[in-house]
Amino acid sequence: LIPYAAFCTLRDEFGTADFSRWGDYARYDKKAVEAYCRRNSREIAFHCFVQYHLHTQLSEVCAYARSRGVVLKGDLPIGVSRTSADAWIHPRLFHMDSQAGAPPDAFSASGQNWGFPTYDWEHMAQDGYAWWQARMAKMAEYFDAFRIDHILGFFRIWEIPVHAVHGLLGYFNPALPYSADELRGMGFDTAGGRFTVPAPDDRMLGELFGELADEVRTTCMKEGRLLPAYATQRKVAERFPGDDPRRSRLREGLMTLLDDVLFIEDPRRKGFFHPRIAAQSTYMYRTLDPQRRDTFDRLHDDFFYPVSYTHLTLP
């Protein structure tokens, strides 16, 4: 309760829940927070007071419902916000360099990006999943049943690098990515960023940007590659905010350009690569010769839609 009250007080003091902007308090330190609480005891007490009344009111509602034969079901979303008290207090339990989402489907061509960090299950296992046990125990005080939103995410999640906006740049975790040697043996040498970094030609720039193509070529690129200031979708989104038609054209075009890769390097296993899902729609795929396209199709489909065991049935 006290760390949560400290989080609320710091959030109000700095005017943002983004704790990376809290200066000396950006990283949770128990002793520093305890000292802060002593200096701000009035504000800390207020947030504790609010939580106490929330607890008593919800407990009364639950008791009344049960006395009338009604049970309450609580909703348990798979993730928590990256600017939450949990992420601030327990950063080691989360992959803060990643975000959860969903691959593209008929309803979302670029996939979904939910924004919250994925769980670091290895660190959670070290204390017997104490964070989860405490979370479930607290919910059990009020609810008789839980609905777990996205139960599959406990076993396999669509993980997107934090610098990306589109779900297209994600990959499944856990997964078995291809090694650089495996890809090289199949005709895809990823050295120097080949197949993993966008390499647009004039035709692609013309299709994406129209009359703005020359501006993109001279302002955003050097030697056929995007400059560092435009090298991620997050940077592009920050660089071109708003709904102005020109800015929107540049932003969306650069976003699409950054999606234009065949493989994504695993951030925690250097030298291992995931095929970019649905990469057959990319300009880069179009530049492949027929034989290499066929090879990519097979390695892509075997990775995402393996059929080797589909003939097996459960006993």
Residue spans for each PLM region:
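Catalytic cores of glycan-processing enzymes that make or break glycosidic bonds
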Residues: 1-312
